[in-house]
């Protein structure tokens, strides 16, 4: 297995001052709703998800959107979380760039990370290169995203994760996939610490500076939210976990992306909030509260934009998830994965207008 090499191209750095990117996702239905509504800023990139180990499987081709011979197909596969096709995401909307969440989890693929490291899935990596050659803009490849999340089986073997990540990068670079930037994304999720009853050192998953163009994390809660369920473990706040990523990024001169951002447990259409999870605040979907738009804004959007402004030196991209989570089987009743709500901006004119103004200020007015 190849390790760090001295001949790799340099990674991006904050000093390169990349433009500030708004990314929208995370499935084709969500993107179509956002784009058709003209409610909000035009994104610089769109989000898609790919199941790496199924890339050559005829049932769904891993959501890649091309078949085994590299030809685009009309199939939009749905894993109960909205229709996906990375090819369509990159070509249907006139937005040239794409952020891809590349799943390497062993939840449905036990033992396959070690096989990836051994070279058993080099054909799947080649198929990624085939797709990327068809994409006119940048590909932000989030390899094994949320590596520290307890829900992602297999990543707990840090060496397997690192070697798998490196093999994918080395292979794509050897195939001259020049439009790819590599994203190392932690979850920064307090609920992971609740599950684990401890806080891991995320640096244990770091594949090395030569393999990372961006660092990233997810943002779903209020920055200073705390659990209302009694727990013996003293939990950090979402802000503290995000700060941990930013500290690493500054130390390693990497730009940062909020790779998944959504107002968890808020419903922008119905103007409500409810419990997310029994391990955090109570039975999922219960304790519903009616809110004003101002309360919704202050409950999630304002803290996120404040965090972006406070860290302008290092955060250069944010990917908003514009989805009706509650209508998707993976996230809807009976809420086995928690209550997520409805984060579609186009269903709430006031929130959409304020979001548009804040994105413009973050991108253009505050430097």
Region roles according to the model:
Residues 34-41, 81-99, 127-136, 204-210, ...:
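Acidic (Asp/Glu)-rich catalytic clusters
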Residues 5-7:
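Bacterial signal peptide processing site
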Residues 74-90, 94-97, 220-271:
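Glycoside hydrolase catalytic-domain groove-lining segments
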Residues 170-199, 253-267, 315-325:
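Aromatic-lined carbohydrate-recognition surfaces of secreted/lumenal glycan-active proteins
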Residues 9-121, 230, 263-266, 278-293, ...:
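N-terminal substrate-binding region of glycoside hydrolase catalytic domains
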Residues 21, 43-47, 95-101, 138-142, ...:
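Structural preference for beta-strand elements that scaffold enzyme active sites
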Residues 56-186, 289-295, 342-347, 354, ...:
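Substrate-binding cleft of extracellular glycoside hydrolase catalytic domains
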Residues 12-37, 50-51, 139, 255-367:
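Substrate-binding cleft of secreted/luminal carbohydrate-active enzymes
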